[in-house]
Amino acid sequence: MFAMNTAYHSIVKILVNSDGSAGTGVAFTTGLNAPDGVAVDGDDNLWVVANQEDEIVVVDPTGKVIAKRGNFNGLTDDGSIDGLLFAASLSFSPNGKVLYVTNLALYLPFAGPANRR
C-alpha cells in the first residue's frame, strides 16, 4: 500500500502485516514535487501526478523514477490550456492501454472583475 505525502514531496510504502492490518510506513521515494494521485500499471510501476510540476512521474517497484511525462505548454491561440496544469489524479482503463488524467486547469474566458448590481 502506498500513501502520497504531498507536503513532504515523498511516497510512503505502508507494509501490510500477516493479519492484513497496516504495518510500518517506510520512505519509498522522495524528491517528487507534491505527489498526489497514483495508479499502478501492469508492471507494478507507480504513475504519480506531481501536480506542482505539471507532470506525471513513473516510479519503478524499487522507488526509482524511470520516466516523466507531460508539462504545461501555455495557452493556445484561443486561450485554452495546452498540456497539464495542476493535474490531480489518474487511472488506467481496464485493459491498461489508456491513462485518464484529471486536470484541474480551467478555461475561463470570462474571468475578470465581477459586475455586481
Where are these regions (language model features)?
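A short beta-strand motif characteristic of beta-propeller blades
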Residues: 23-30, 65-80
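Structural signal for beta-propeller blades
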Residues: 9-12, 54-57, 107-109
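Short loop/turn segments immediately following beta-strands, especially the blade-tip
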Residues: 14-21, 61-64
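Blade-level signature of beta-propeller repeat domains, shared across WD40, Kelch, NHL, RCC1
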Residues: 89-117
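Beta-rich, blade/repeat-based domains predominating
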Residues: 1, 29-47, 53, 76-97
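Oxyanion-binding "anion nests"
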Residues: 2-15
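Short loop/turn segments immediately following the C-termini of beta-strands
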Residues: 5-7, 51-52, 61, 104-106
